[in-house]
Amino acid sequence: MINMRQSHPLIKMINHSFIDLPAPSNISTWWNFGSLLGVCLMLQIITGLFLAMHYTADTSTAFSSVTHICRDVNYGWLIRYAHANGASVFFIFLYFHIGRGIYYGSYQFKETWNIGVILLFMVMGTAFMGYVLPWGQMSFWGATVITNLLSAIPYMGPTLVEWIWGGFSVDKATLTRFFAFHFILPFIITAMVMIHLLFLHETGSNNPSGLNSDSDKIPFHPYYSIKDILGFMFMLLLLLALVLFSPDLLGDPDNYTPANPLNTPPHIKPEWYFLFAYAILRSIPNKLGGVLALVFSILILMLFPIMHVSKQRSMSFRPFSQCLLWILVANLIILTWIGGQPVEHPFIIIGQLASISYFCIILILMPTSSFMENKMLKW
C-alpha cells in the first residue's frame, strides 16, 4: 500500500516541498535563512493578530491603546516587543538571504529572484506602515516625510499624496488605511512566498560551488529539517535576548512621545533597517532625483541576472568579486550609519560618496571584475 504522504493530494504537496524534496548535499548554513524568514513571517502574523485584538486605529486612542497593551494586557509587553523586534530580526535575515543570493549566484533563477525582490518591496512597505501605527512622534513625522516623497512625481504627485493621506495632512484617515494595509499585506506576502517556493522547486536549490548538483542530492528531511531547527533555536535566542533584555535598543525614543503635528522632532529618521536607503535618498539635493535613487537602490537587484558576465555562477572561486562584495557590505554599513546622522558637514559628503560608490560597485566594478576573472582563466 502506498504511503499516505505520497498519495493524499494535500499532504503530497507538503511532502514534495518539505520532506522528500531533493536537496544538494553540500548547502551551508547560508541556506538556512529562507526557512528562518518563513518562521519570522509566521511569528509576525501571530503576534500581529494578538496586537490587533487590542489596538485601535484612531488618532485619539492609538498611542494610549499601545500603552494599554504594554501595561494592562496579559503578556502584552511581550507580544508588542516580540512584534517590534521580530521585524528587526526579519530584516537582518532578509539582508543575509539577499547577500547569500548575490554571493553564490542564486539570482540566475530569474523568476525566483524577481519574486524575491517584489517580496522585499512588499515587506518594506508593510514595515513602514507598521511603524506608523503606534502614533508616536516618529510615526507621524516619518509617515509625513515618506508619503510626501510621492509629490515629486511629475503632474500627478500632489494629488496622489492627498489621495493616500485621505485629506490634506496625515490624519485619522491615513492611520486607518495604514492599519488596514498593514493587516492584509502579510497574508499577500505569504501567498507570494508560496509562489517564490514554487519557482524555486522547479529548478531545485543552488549550492556553494555553483555547479549542477543533480548527481548528488539528499532528502530534505531529516537532514535539513534538523539543520533548520538549529537555526530556529538561534533565532529564538537572539529574539528573546532582544525582547527581554533591551527591547528598545533598536527603537527611537521619540516614538514614546505622542504624535504632535505642531512640534517637529529635531531629526526625522526611519527604523534602522531603512537607513541605508534613507541615506541614498538624502544624498541627492533634488527631490525627484532622491526618490528615483531610493527606488533604484532596491530595484537594482533585478539587474543582477542581466549583469552576470562571469563564466562561473558562484563567487566561491572568484577572489576579486568576493572583495568587491565585501566592500559593498562595508559601504552599506556606512550608509546605514550616515542615515542615522544629522544633515551637516562631514556626514553630507560621506553619504554622497557612499551613495555613488554603492551604484558604481554594482553597475561598473562587479561586471568588470567578472570580465577580468574570465580573461585570467583564459575563458
UniProtKB/Swiss-Prot annotation:
One of its GO terms (molecular function) is ubiquinol-cytochrome-c reductase activity. Heme b b566 binds at H97, H196. Its cofactor is heme b. The chain crosses the membrane at residues 33-53, 77-98, 113-133, 178-198, 226-246, 288-308, 320-340, 347-367. Component of the ubiquinol-cytochrome c reductase complex (complex III or cytochrome b-c1 complex) that is part of the mitochondrial respiratory chain. The b-c1 complex mediates electron transfer from ubiquinol to cytochrome c. Contributes to the generation of a proton gradient across the mitochondrial membrane that is then used for ATP synthesis. GO terms for biological process: mitochondrial electron transport, ubiquinol to cytochrome c. It is found in: Mitochondrion inner membrane. Keywords: Electron transport, Heme, Iron, Membrane, Metal-binding, Mitochondrion, Mitochondrion inner membrane, Respiratory chain, Transmembrane, Transmembrane helix, Transport, Ubiquinone. InterPro entries: Cyt_b/b6_C, Cyt_b/b6_C_sf, Cyt_b/b6_N, Cytb/b6-like_sf, Cytochrome_b, Cytochrome_b_C_euk/bac, Cytochrome_b_N_euk/bac, Di-haem_cyt_TM. Signal peptide: none annotated. Heme b b562 binds at H83, H182. Binds 2 heme b groups non-covalently. It is a multi-pass membrane protein. This is Cytochrome b. Heme 1 (or BL or b562) is low-potential and absorbs at about 562 nm, and heme 2 (or BH or b566) is high-potential and absorbs at about 566 nm. It comes from the Eukaryota. GO terms for cellular component: mitochondrial inner membrane; respiratory chain complex III. Belongs to the cytochrome b family.
